[in-house]
Swiss-Prot record:
Subcellular location: Cell inner membrane
Organism: Nitratidesulfovibrio vulgaris (strain DSM 19637 / Miyazaki F) (Desulfovibrio vulgaris)
Residues annotated as binding GTP: D17, H18, G19, K20, S21, T22, N134, K135, V136, D137
Secretion signal, residue range per the UniProt entry: none
All residue ranges annotated as the tr-type G domain in the record: 5-187
Name of the featured protein: Elongation factor 4
Function summary: Required for accurate and efficient protein synthesis under certain stress conditions. May act as a fidelity factor of the translation reaction, by catalyzing a one-codon backward translocation of tRNAs on improperly translocated ribosomes. Back-translocation proceeds from a post-translocation (POST) complex to a pre-translocation (PRE) complex, thus giving elongation factor G a second chance to translocate the tRNAs correctly. Binds to ribosomes in a GTP-dependent manner.
GO annotations of cellular component type: plasma membrane
Record's keyword terms, sorted: Cell inner membrane, Cell membrane, GTP-binding, Hydrolase, Membrane, Nucleotide-binding, Protein biosynthesis
Domain of life: Bacteria
Length: 601
């Protein structure tokens, strides 16, 4: 067991694409952990999707033995964290397992919004932060400007920031020396009762749930009986070890160390991220603070395009939930789409990733309904309820008040595009709170916005309005009363539940009109006329018609009596009427996507 003063636990904080995973790769190579033969980009991102999108979704840990220049042998535990705002809770738990962090900033781009959010999380956990300027080999790199930006926006002293190029490996050895010299060693009591923090867990089909943890106090040995605070359940440790970066089995781990255990835990929900492990016979009195249940924020319906795939979808969702405790689902039926599931996600990226994994790993073709958020309702009879599906909203006469979630958003943008950003935020019912310069040409704008307005197309429009230069970060603040209405879409007088949305009263007419027009373009023409109507309650606010396809029934009449032609046309008209009464309109997949793309025009 290494001595505590020779252990360093750290994580790497960076905005997407600033070189976090590349720096981790170089550290593994410089310390000789990964040979040239095993080398591959983004070594710690095990999921194919993580490597393809260039993002880190799950937290990982790796134990790195390092001999410093003074000859001492150290154990460095790198805890790789996700960088995206959706996975904020995972980031906060990973940071709670560390004493220090490397703040990696792209020397050509400067400080971005999500970097700031994660740095503030690190400072909340009292971590020592070392600034690292990456990509200094690029011609566009401006290290002095970026140092100034970091000092201005975060207040970190950058006089001894390390300038590196993770791509070429330049100065990576200096980063390792800085970790050893400047980051504090863990403080834990080996003789105290066991207390260990779970910062990640995943499901393995052979060993059950694998738990990644950091020991705060005490010693954990193979064969010990342990219990978890949140569930009060007890287990026996069957396997104990560390990732270095492949699995190395251990017999014991002490305070300050990071490792994994297997204990025949059957469900991921039993080993929640942020929970505390302790011994059954000598339990700790209080858990590690900061544990909270993760609540889904965004909901949408997922339906198989072929109803025969329903069981396959169910199996796929069960498998995904084993590895993602923040993801929730429950069965639901839709008159338009048949049987499917209502799924809850942490945010938009999370939703995209789950959908992509379902299609890629399980080959399930999906129809996804428009995403919605959780609304709170006070009914006239004094009851309170939460609604995550617009089609479940009660009749407007029964609603006393409707509340929607608001978020506080920080947007970092070059000053050339400030006008576009302000226009977009105002259009999305935002309330401007603050605006200031963090550098001569970069502005940070703070807005409070309804979460429902971000869910649709906000991120895409922000990127296109700023040529990709803007970055954003948001956090949930509270629920506020709003003038919201449910907008129904009727096709030939029948409401299509999967197209119902909750919108602000001021936007209802414009949205209803745009959606009806979009549907007119996507629904194929039928043998009878199709009426598309947008309605609030009983009131129709917009209508579009798709004209019928018709055969030229008078083609066989050459000259002759007009009454003959009229008779044939009347007969056709009767047939169309009967068809309209009996006929069903098949809605293509594009019709449901139309609801997601209304704001694009």
């Amino acid at each position: 067991m290494p001595r505590q003063e020779h252990i360093r636990n750290f994580s790497i904080i960076a905005h997407i694409d600033h070189g976090k995973s590349t720096l981790a790769d170089r550290i593994l190579e410089v310390t000789g952990l990964v040979s040239d033969r095993e080398k591959r980009d983004q070594y710690l991102d095990r999921m194919e999707l993580e490597r393809e999108r260039g993002i880190t979704i799950k937290a990982q840990s790796v134990r790195i033995p390092y001999t410093a220049k003074d000859g001492r042998k150290y154990v460095l535990n790198l805890i790789d964290t996700p960088g995206h705002v959706d996975f904020n809770y995972e980031v906060s738990r990973s940071l709670a397992a560390c004493e220090g962090a490397l703040l990696v900033v792209d020397a050509s781009q400067g400080v971005e919004a999500q970097t700031l959010a994660n740095v503030y999380l690190a400072l909340d956990h009292n971590l020592e932060v070392i600034p690292v300027l990456n990509k200094v080999d690029l011609p566009s790199a401006d290290a002095d400007r970026v140092k100034h930006e970091i000092e201005e926006s975060i207040g970190l002293d950058c006089s001894d920031a390390v300038a590196v190029s993770a791509k070429t490996g330049l100065n990576v050895d200096k980063v390792l020396e800085a970790i050893v010299e400047r980051l504090p060693a863990p403080e834990g009591n080996l003789n105290a009762p066991l207390k260990a923090l779970i910062f990640d867990s995943w499901y393995d089909s052979y060993q059950g749930v694998v738990v990644l943890f950091r020991i705060v106090d005490g010693v954990l040995r193979k064969g010990d009986r342990i219990k978890l605070f949140a569930t009060e359940r007890s287990y026996e440790v069957i396997r104990l070890g560390v990732f270095s970066p492949e699995i190395v089995d251990m017999t014991e781990l002490g305070a300050g160390e990071v490792g994994f255990l297997c204990a025949n835990i059957k469900e991921l929900g039993d080993a929640k991220v942020g929970d505390t492990i302790t011994h059954v016979d000598r339990p700790a009195e209080v858990p590690v603070e900061g544990f909270k249940e993760v609540q889904p924020m965004v909901f949408c319906g997922l339906y198989p395009t072929d109803s025969a795939d329903y069981e396959q979808l169910k199996y796929a969702l069960e498998k995904l939930q084993l590895n993602d405790a923040a993801f929730s689902y429950e069965p639901e039926t839709s008159q338009a789409l048949g049987f499917g599931y209502r799924c809850g996600f942490l945010g938009l990226l999370h939703m995209e990733i789950i959908q992509e994994r379902l299609e890629r790993e399980f080959q399930v073709e999906l129809i996804a309904t428009a995403p919605s958020v959780i609304y709170k309702i006070d009914t006239v009879d004094g009851k309170k309820s939460d609604i995550d599906n617009p089609s479940k909203l009660p009749d407007p006469t029964k609603i006393a008040a409707l509340y929607e979630p608001y978020v506080r958003m920080d947007i970092h943008v070059p000053n050339d595009y400030v006008g576009n950003v302000l226009k977009l935020c105002e259009e999305k019912r935002g309330i401007q709170k603050n605006m200031g310069y963090i550098a001569s040409n970069r502005v940070v704008i703070t807005y409070e916005l309804p979460f429902a307005e971000i869910v649709f197309d906000f991120f895409d429009r922000l990127k296109s309005g700023t040529k990709g230069y803007a970055s954003m970060d948001y956090e949930f603040i509270d629920y506020r009363q709003s003038a919201l209405v449910k907008l129904d879409i009727l096709i030939n007088g029948e409401a299509v539940d999967a197209l119902a949305v909750i919108v602000h009263r001021d936007k209802a007419y414009h949205y209803g009109r745009a959606l009806a027009l979009k549907l007119k373009r996507t629904i194929p023409r039928q043998m009878f006329e199709v009426a598309i109507q947008a309605a609030i309650g009983q009131k129709i606010i917009a209508r579009e018609s798709i004209s019928a396809l018709r055969k030229n029934v008078t083609a066989k009449c050459y000259g002759g009596d007009i009454t003959r032609k009229r008779k044939l046309l009347e007969k056709q008209k009767e047939g169309k009427k009967r068809m309209k009464r009996m006929g069903n309109v098949e809605l293509p997949q594009e019709a449901f996507l139309a609801a997601l793309q209304v704001g694009d025009e």
